[in-house]
């Protein structure tokens, strides 16, 4: 399948900003779920909790067959049947604190197409 990358270029540079608050309730639920796997020196807010913050919300009926939010909201409308997380790098600059407001800024930095064993793949790099 050929992907028209030119039609996806308008998404380059698109930014999404979301905020969330590190509530004691969220931290308690995270600790209860991952108790045995948490690093003892994590402090008041355990490492990894950032995956539970600033989540996208979409009505269940609007989710795609792959369980993701509809394409074309933040991510470009890539004409392929499924999406997956390909990897990331996380740097902890300072410890998070209970009650802190956390801001996530995501920017689409690059869109590339490659041929894999299963066919065409499109990689959307989000910074």
Residue ranges, per PLM feature:
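Hydrophobic beta-sheet segments that form the core/acyl-binding groove
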Residues: 83-127
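Hydrophobic, proline/glycine-rich low-complexity stretches
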Residues: 1-101
């Amino acid at each position: 399948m050929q992907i028209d990358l030119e039609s996806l270029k308008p998404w380059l540079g698109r930014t999404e900003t979301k905020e969330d608050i590190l509530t004691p309730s969220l931290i308690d639920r995270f600790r209860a779920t991952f108790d045995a796997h948490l690093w003892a020196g994590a402090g008041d807010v355990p490492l990894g909790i950032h995956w539970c913050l600033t989540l996208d919300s979409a009505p269940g009926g609007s989710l795609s067959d792959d369980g993701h939010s509809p394409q074309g909201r933040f991510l470009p409308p890539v004409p392929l049947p499924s999406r997956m997380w390909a990897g990331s790098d996380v740097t902890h600059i300072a410890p998070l604190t209970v009650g802190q407001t956390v801001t996530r800024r995501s920017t689409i930095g690059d869109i590339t197409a490659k041929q894999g064993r299963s066919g065409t793949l499109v990689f959307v790099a989000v910074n």
